[in-house]
């Protein structure tokens, strides 16, 4: 079975890992980084993803960041006259990670385990699955981020019984889950969280502070200037990271705006204590779900054996201190908060392929599920923190005499009134035979699969007529839309590939022109006028082709010039060899001459010898 990669699709950064042997390995992207910014930029018809997209966020208005916050909604991004759904933007990030994995493995990748915040509802999970499909990935499993982190942490500790609290504060979401680990079983006891709280919010309090201070000093509101705001965002993110290691940082943004007297510069010193004061309400917001998770699991803080911190925002010292104070123990420092989720997803991929044995993952549904009943109330069928997959049925009846149909309004949430909860979908069971109210027996069944995705069935027990629905929220995509987006993604990938090839070809051709000019100059009188003229002619032909748009012509002219330069190089090489041979022959002759010694001779008189 082919490899199943693990992907942490994050709000600000994403990460991809694969199981090698028994160990999960994080795959570096082409820039050599282990995480990739979840940023997509559109420029001159080209799509760019990752660091290259993030770098142009200040100057390019067609840059999309933190799209994960809009998953499962009907939000759209309008770029260059075209609308993109959050699923399509996320698919571009996933496709980039898929390409990274394929380059590393040297093989096609089409299966993945993708993580989501534990507190993601059904619509958000379905949107994530759709994004994977658009990117050309078969999503084998959607698992919760804290659960994935616990898998990576506990893989080599299967012989120990532990209760672990995972505190996951990412770029845009916050989750806390409590798991019980033992004998290879990873059982989630409870989960809680806040889908609208993350590192972006910590950046925002710094941005608001900088805007306020600058306005006080200069009377200019930077929040109305889009380009200034992006510079502030980058500076705030950097300052937040700096303050995890130092107690004070300098924020310097020259020419941030202009006033009547000329350009204005922002120079502010931000201390860690000031940042902690600004972020205090956000940190306190993380404590309520933590207490809720403990309460739902029926545990006290003293029963927690280990605390695992996940997500880049847990590097903030005040966050670590708050967790330590609440739970009463130091957090575990043995995992990388940016990479541990992707590693856990890769382990789950190994479980699916059979490469990891004796590991069982028992996850839970984060929110209660039910339907609307008389009086606008919500009747819960499946309580939150129920282990999945699961199924639950309940029998209802009609509210009026001879009622021909019933509306099933499917809800997710914890509030008693239907209107205060999230609507997952609506459908109708029709053709109910005429009968007094309360007589028809309508059985409603909720089924949640291992990915946390809901299927609902309504059945008239009198006629056995059945109607079912796989929940499709208002933001969900139809199969036709997904197929169209898959096709678009493939075409874009092909177009991007062609564009890259064209850029590479033009760069190679430019380089060749320069090389030929240099070679002709260096050789001087060592080449014949005929060869020189031929090379010049082919070089000029290539330069002329480069000014046009005919790629095939550039390719042909480049090949012609390459042949000329090869022939020229061969001739020069032969000349050099001949010259070297002649030099060696001359040196040998000189040496032979110098080896002839002048001999002394004496004239011999034969007559005298005979005497």
UniProtKB/Swiss-Prot annotation:
Induction: By stress conditions e.g. heat shock. Belongs to the heat shock protein 70 family. Keywords: ATP-binding, Chaperone, Nucleotide-binding, Phosphoprotein, Stress response. InterPro entries: ATPase_NBD, Chaperone_DnaK, Heat_shock_70_CS, HSP70_C_sf, HSP70_peptide-bd_sf, Hsp_70_fam. CDD domains: ASKHA_NBD_HSP70_DnaK-like (cd10234). GO terms for molecular function: ATP binding; ATP-dependent protein folding chaperone; unfolded protein binding. Disulfide bonds: none annotated. Residues 525-548, 573-611 are annotated as: Disordered. Residues 574-591 have a biased composition (Low complexity). It comes from Staphylococcus haemolyticus (strain JCSC1435). This is Chaperone protein DnaK. Gene3D superfamilies: 1.20.1270.10, 3.30.420.40, Actin, Chain A, domain 4 (3.90.640.10), Substrate Binding Domain Of DNAk, Chain A, domain 1 (2.60.34.10). It comes from the Bacteria. The gene is dnaK. The modification Phosphothreonine is found at residue 173. HAMAP family: DnaK (MF_00332). Acts as a chaperone. Residues 529-542, 599-611 have a biased composition (Basic and acidic residues). It holds the Pfam family HSP70.
């Amino acid at each position: 079975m082919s490899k199943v990669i693990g992907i942490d699709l994050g709000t600000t950064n994403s990460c991809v890992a694969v199981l090698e042997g028994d160990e999960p390995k994080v795959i570096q992207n082409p820039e050599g980084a282990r995480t990739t910014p979840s940023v997509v930029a559109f420029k001159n018809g080209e799509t760019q993803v990752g660091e290259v997209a993030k770098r142009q966020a200040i100057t390019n208005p067609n840059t999309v960041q933190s799209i994960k916050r809009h998953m499962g909604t009907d939000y759209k991004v309008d770029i260059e006259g075209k609308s993109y759904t959050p699923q399509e933007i996320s698919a571009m990030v996933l496709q980039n990670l898929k390409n990274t994995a394929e380059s590393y493995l040297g093989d096609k990748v089409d299966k993945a385990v993708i993580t989501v915040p534990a507190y993601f509802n059904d619509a958000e999970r379905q949107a994530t699955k759709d994004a994977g499909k658009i990117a050309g990935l078969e999503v084998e499993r959607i698992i919760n981020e804290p659960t994935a982190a616990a898998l990576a942490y506990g893989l080599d500790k299967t012989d120990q019984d532990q209760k672990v609290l995972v505190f996951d504060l990412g770029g845009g979401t916050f989750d806390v889950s409590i798991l019980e680990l033992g004998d290879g079983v990873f059982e989630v006891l409870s989960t809680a969280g806040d889908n609208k709280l993350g590192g972006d919010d910590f950046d925002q309090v710094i941005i608001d502070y900088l805007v306020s201070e600058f306005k006080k000093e200069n009377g200019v509101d930077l929040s109305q200037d889009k380009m200034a705001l992006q510079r502030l965002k980058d500076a705030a993110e950097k300052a937040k990271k700096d303050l995890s290691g130092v107690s004070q940082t300098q924020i310097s943004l020259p020419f941030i705006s202009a006033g009547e007297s000329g350009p204005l510069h922002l120079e502010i010193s931000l201390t860690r204590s000031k940042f902690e004061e600004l972020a205090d309400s956000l940190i306190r917001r993380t404590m309520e779900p933590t207490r809720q998770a403990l309460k739902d699991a029926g545990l006290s803080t003293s029963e927690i054996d280990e605390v695992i911190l996940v997500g880049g925002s847990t590097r903030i010292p005040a966050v670590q201190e708050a967790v330590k104070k609440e739970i009463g123990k130091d957090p575990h420092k043995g995992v990388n908060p940016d990479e541990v989720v992707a590693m856990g997803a890769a382990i789950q991929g190994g479980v699916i392929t059979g490469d990891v044995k004796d590991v069982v993952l028992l996850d839970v549904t984060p929110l209660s599920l039910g339907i609307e009943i008389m009086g606008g109330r919500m009747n819960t069928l499946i309580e939150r923190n129920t282990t999945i997959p699961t199924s639950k049925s309940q029998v209802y009846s009609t509210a009026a005499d001879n009622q021909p149909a019933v509306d099933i309004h499917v809800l997710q949430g914890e509030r008693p009134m239907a209107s205060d909860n999230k609507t997952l979908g609506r459908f109708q069971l029709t053709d109910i035979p005429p009968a007094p109210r309360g007589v028809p027996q309508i059985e409603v069944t909720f089924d949640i699969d291992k990915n946390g995705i809901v299927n609902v069935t309504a059945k008239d027990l009198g006629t056995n007529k059945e109607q079912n629905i796989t929940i499709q929220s208002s933001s969900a995509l139809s199969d036709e839309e997904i197929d169209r987006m898959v096709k678009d993604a493939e075409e874009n990938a092909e177009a991007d590939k062609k564009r890259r090839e064209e850029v590479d070809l033009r760069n190679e051709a430019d380089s060749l022109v320069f090389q030929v000019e240099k070679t002709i100059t260096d050789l001087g009188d060592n080449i014949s006028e005929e060869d020189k003229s031929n090379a010049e002619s082919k070089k000029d032909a290539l330069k002329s082709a480069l000014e046009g748009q005919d790629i095939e012509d550039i390719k042909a002219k480049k090949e012609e010039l390459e042949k000329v330069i090869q022939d020229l190089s061969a001739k020069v090489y032969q000349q050099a060899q001949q010259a070297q041979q002649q030099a060696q022959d001359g040196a040998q002759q000189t040496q032979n001459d110098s080896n002839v010694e002048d001999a002394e001779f004496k004239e011999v008189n034969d007559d005298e010898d005979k005497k």
